[in-house]
A protein has these predicted regions:
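Catalytic His-Asp charge-relay segment
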Residues: 97-105
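Gly/Ala-rich beta-loop-alpha elbow adjacent to hydrolase catalytic centers
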Residues: 60-69
């Protein structure tokens, strides 16, 4: 974890994964340490926070919110989190970096997210970390925050 990290931008997913639901997935102690913004998936980054310093900022997306992270990805971000994300084939060619952390369970998606595993392989191939877990889709966000952020 980058010790300079101070701003976290989180995109939720569809249906139940609203900003209110995502808020409950983030450990209480994190709210006192970081400036956290949570937005519905599809919200443009510029509408969430106008002035973002990538060196001190994190982009995190769950499910459909993963697409928001992928389309805004830059190696300069302090931390990039992909939580069982929706993906597209074009992102299996992205040059990720050591700032990228992905947790996913391909069995949650069936055939509707066919590029998920190729994106995970690309994350690893280009310097990031991707871990497949055996976990219900709705349980992965809490696990992600508890695993990748420590007091």
């Amino acid at each position: 974890m980058n010790s300079l990290l101070c701003t976290i931008i989180v995109w939720g997913g569809m249906h139940y994964a609203t900003p209110e639901w995502m808020e409950k997935q983030i450990p209480e102690w994190m709210w006192g340490r970081y400036e956290i913004f949570i937005a519905p998936y599809g919200t443009p980054l510029s509408e969430i926070k106008a002035d973002i310093d990538p060196k001190t900022s994190a982009l995190i997306g769950f499910s459909a919110g993963g697409l928001d992270v992928l389309q805004n990805y830059k190696k300069e971000y302090a931390f990039v989190g992909l939580i069982d994300p929706s993906t597209r084939d074009k992102y299996s060619k992205t040059e990720f970096g050591s700032n990228t952390f992905m947790v996913y369970d391909a069995s949650n998606w069936g055939n509707i997210n066919a590029s998920l595993e190729s994106v995970a392989r690309q994350v690893i191939k280009t310097g990031g970390k991707a871990a497949e877990v055996n976990m219900d889709h709705s349980k992965i966000p809490k696990y992600f925050f508890e695993t990748h952020f420590r007091k």
